[in-house]
Regions:
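Amphipathic alpha-helix face/heptad-repeat signature
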Residues: 9, 53, 74, 266, ...
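Sequence-specific dsDNA recognition surfaces
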Residues: 153-160, 175-191, 205-237, 257, ...
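Short, ligand-facing micro-motifs at secondary-structure edges
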Residues: 3-8, 17-23, 27, 188, ...
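Conserved catalytic core of Hanks-type protein kinase domains
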Residues: 9, 88, 241, 283, ...
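Short, solvent-exposed loop/turn positions at domain surfaces
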Residues: 26, 225-226, 301, 344-347
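Non-catalytic DNA-recognition/assembly elements of restriction-modification systems
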Residues: 39, 43, 47-54, 62, ...
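Short amphipathic coiled-coil heptad-repeat segments
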Residues: 61-105, 113, 117, 121-153, ...
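A short glycine-rich beta-alpha junction/loop motif
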Residues: 1-4, 14, 25-48, 259-268, ...
Length: 407
């Protein structure tokens, strides 16, 4: 049998399905023994046709491999471009800065430092309003104003090891704009998305791949555990506190919410004061933001890292004027929307290449890939000759050499 033909047919969907049907599994690993292999029936064309099929498969796969390699090169280039856009955005190089525009137009502007002071005032006001509402709901009147002394001013954090920023920008700890972090709970659920009228719990994978995915939710069956205050709402900023080292800290803005789904213990909601969530999103996704998350995440195993709320608040980010945040975010969206379109096209074409590879193999073993030659030696004659050779030269197990002492 032609070696290339055997290798190709062994990789075909028909043979793979037969093997999986006869194989046994242990801990998710498929195992087949020699008897199973001997029972697998293979289509056997004439030897000359096997060679023609092998040549044609090789030719078409070479073209297909070149196409896949080209698509993956573009994919890698888009990944680098995405990173460069985010880097330029966080360094003030993507759009004219507010300082440049103000100087050109002869006007003043609110600097990042002034914005930070305003954020701290707003942060405290929101905290006090939230605490007063909680006491009201609990039926506890705030007679003693001493409860306000429980407010903790956010730490500034050390920034001397960070690079210089454009005029009008300032470094800030994430503790400044975050006035509250909300977390849900973990409990047993049905492993399927909730149906209409049911309530779900968000899984880590719902925030892993760039946008909020409502399909990645579990269904809560215990109505006593449903907490409407923990439901994801449109505009929520969601953050994954636990995942692999490359995925921990992934975050999304919940743009569209059509299902009832609660926060889990691993998916946090940030409540922000005077910070554009779009700006926070792009800074945390940038190289500098990812470096901060890796610096602060804990855990000994690469497969699972965690970043607690206290450490989240220590993340340092650049803070430009609020008008500049909006302009940068809009420009990043404009550029990355093109990237996402191209990435989607590449993903579609890679899937098409995978299907085409299987289609080539299927056609090959249905006798439709190359023309058949009536002058070829019939496969039945070839098979009879193979059986005769096997009967005349029965295989014998090789004798094992005895092991010597010290081997």
């Amino acid at each position: 049998m032609e070696a290339r033909f055997l290798a190709a047919i062994w990789d075909s969907p028909t043979v793979r399905e037969k093997l999986e049907q006869t194989a046994r599994t242990t801990a998710g690993i498929f195992k087949v023994n020699q008897q199973d292999l001997n029972r697998v029936a293979l289509p056997l064309p004439p030897l000359a046709e096997q060679r023609r099929i092998g040549d044609e498969i090789e030719k078409q796969f070479t073209r297909l491999d070149a196409a896949v390699a080209g698509l993956k090169r573009i994919q890698a280039s888009l990944k680098r471009y995405r990173a460069s856009v985010l880097k330029a955005a966080c360094e003030g190089r993507l759009v004219p800065t507010e300082a440049e525009l103000a100087r050109r137009e002869g006007r003043g502007y609110e600097t990042g430092e002034q914005l930070l002071k305003r954020i701290l005032v707003e942060r405290r006001a929101r905290w006090e309003a939230d605490q007063a509402e909680r006491m009201k709901v609990a039926g506890k009147a705030a007679k003693d104003p001493g409860w306000k002394s429980r407010y903790e001013e956010p730490a500034v954090g050390e920034t001397s090891d960070l690079g210089a920023l454009p005029a009008g920008w300032v470094w800030a700890a994430l503790s400044a704009p975050i006035w509250d972090i909300e977390a849900g709970r973990s409990f047993r659920c049905l492993e399927r998305p909730p149906l209409p009228g049911e309530t779900g719990v968000v899984k880590v994978s719902a925030v892993t791949w760039g946008s909020y995915d409502e399909e990645e939710t579990k269904t809560c069956t215990d109505l006593d555990r449903v907490d409407n205050s923990l439901l994801v709402r449109p505009g929520d900023f969601l953050f994954s506190r636990a995942n692999t080292i490359d995925l921990v800290g992934n975050c999304v803005i919940a743009r569209q919410v059509t299902r009832r789904a609660m926060l889990s213990d691993k998916i946090l909601r940030f409540r922000l004061a005077l910070l554009a969530p779009e700006w926070l999103l792009l800074t945390l996704r940038s190289g500098q933001g990812r470096a901060e998350i890796r610096r602060l995440a804990t855990g000994n195993q690469e497969s699972m890292r965690n970043i607690g709320q206290d450490r989240i608040r220590q993340i340092r980010l650049p803070l430009p004027p609020i008008a500049e945040q909006a302009r940068i975010s809009a420009e990043v969206d404009r550029r990355l929307s093109v990237v996402e379109e191209l990435e989607s096209t590449i993903h579609t074409n890679l899937a098409r290449c995978a299907r085409l590879r299987q289609s080539i193999l299927k056609r090959a073993f249905e006798g439709k890939l190359v023309p058949q030659d009536p002058n070829d030696e019939p496969a039945s004659v070839l098979l009879a000759r193979l059986r005769k050779e096997r009967d005349e030269n029965p295989g014998r197990p090789a004798k094992r050499k005895p092991r010597r002492a010290g081997d």
